Amino acid sequence: MESLTLQPINKIQGEVNLPGSKSVSNRALLLAALAKGTTRLTNLLDSDDIRHMLNALTKLGVQYQLSEDKTECVVEGLGRPFSVSEPVELFLGNAGTAMRPLAAALCLGEGEYVLTGEPRMKERPIGHLVKALKAAGADVTYLENENYPPLKIVGTGLKPGSVSIDGSISSQFLTAFLMSAPLAEGDIRINIEGELVSKPYIDITLHIMKQFGVDVINNDYQEFVIPVGQQYVAPGDFLVEGDASSASYFLAAAAIKGGEVKVTGIGKNSIQGDIQFADALEKMGADIEWGDDYVISRVGQLKGIDMDYNHIPDAAMTIATTALFAEGTTSIRNVYNWRVKETDRLSAMATELRKVGAEVEEGEDYIIVKPVPQLTHAAIDTYDDHRMAMCFSLVALSDKPVTINDPKCTSKTFPDYFDKLKALSC
């Protein structure tokens, strides 16, 4: 297996222009495909997850032109649901942002589809979404294990009425249903069971739907009403924001060992909830400055904090490794959905933090990290999880090197991450 050893970094200084957001890129690609008219997406993320969505759209008959650097895509919208005359199999890797929304969208039109992916995708739950789709008349079958991909879908349309979705595990189930609901046969009312996790990701979904001409009535995240008679309409140009989750590593690095780092492509008006990572970093003692399209982080005397991170679960992973450089204990709470991400992130994070010497308590939905005066050089297993690799790169900000196993797993969202980090290292 390939590995990368990062030598100790003395100081972090500079500017980073963020790659496009994964969450925004795949949502916008799907809506551009369903919309009437042509959409030009700029600052599109070039990564594995986006490639899986683009490959799927090709098989579904969508025409698009992708620029040479793969960051601009002109999509010719179908102006209707997908329809195929022959059965189609879509391989979606480990891309939850492709699997869940496509599973819902393919129920709308006509044709027979199989959705599958990598072994880990077959361990990521989809039962809450399928249950809701079936309640709306969809024809969905599990091909291997109940509640998990791969799925067989026969397009029959979605019937009007009320459905319930369990919101306690992943917001992607709700996102998937919301994006398909405007093309149902009548009004759809979605009731949320349990406490909805990752609400800011639903805000992203609703915001992008509105940019494509569809309004959703949001009753305090407990009920969503999608009136019939709406159609997705291409907005013309669509700028994909920089990826706020990816910003977290650079903002944290500056807080630990700046200098300062200016991150461009996101700012105080960003639609992504993960920009709230900067607020958490500020609570820990970092010096944060906000602009319309940038965030600056400067070194601070960091201290451990106890906080609920349910609203920013992806960026919260970066807090876990930042905690190695804080004074006192850091508690990351209400992040059960780490367990159903690219890997079981609670277990993986606890295991790897212990390798570098930290004292760690892992609970059902929390992790508590106590730093130690001296970290240990360790080989970090990344579990084919891009965020594990990027989070643990921060260990190099100590006086010890860190070895990252399978560093290319960052290609899921940020293929040139380590080059960007090196460019900031003094």
Swiss-Prot record:
Keyword Transferase set for record: yes
Gene Ontology BP annotations: amino acid biosynthetic process; aromatic amino acid family biosynthetic process; chorismate biosynthetic process
Compartment(s) where it occurs, according to its Swiss-Prot or TrEMBL record: Cytoplasm
Domain of life: Bacteria
EC number from the UniProt entry: 2.5.1.19
Binding of phosphoenolpyruvate, residues: 22, 96, 124, 172, 345, 387, 412
One Pfam match: EPSP_synthase
Residues the record marks as active site: 314 (proton acceptor)
Top EC class of this enzyme: transferase
Pathway: Metabolic intermediate biosynthesis; chorismate biosynthesis; chorismate from D-erythrose 4-phosphate and phosphoenolpyruvate: step 6/7
One cellular component (GO) term of this entry: cytoplasm
InterPro entries: Enolpyruvate_Tfrase_dom, Enolpyruvate_Tfrase_sf, EPSP_synthase, EPSP_synthase_CS, RNA3'P_cycl/enolpyr_Trfase_a/b
Keywords carried by this UniProt record: Amino-acid biosynthesis, Aromatic amino acid biosynthesis, Cytoplasm, Transferase
GO MF annotations in UniProt: 3-phosphoshikimate 1-carboxyvinyltransferase activity
Main location: cytoplasm
SUPFAM superfamilies: EPT/RTPC-like
Chain's role: Catalyzes the transfer of the enolpyruvyl moiety of phosphoenolpyruvate (PEP) to the 5-hydroxyl of shikimate-3-phosphate (S3P) to produce enolpyruvyl shikimate-3-phosphate and inorganic phosphate.
NCBIfam families assigned: aroA
Family in the record: Belongs to the EPSP synthase family.
Protein name: 3-phosphoshikimate 1-carboxyvinyltransferase
Species annotation: Vibrio campbellii (strain ATCC BAA-1116)
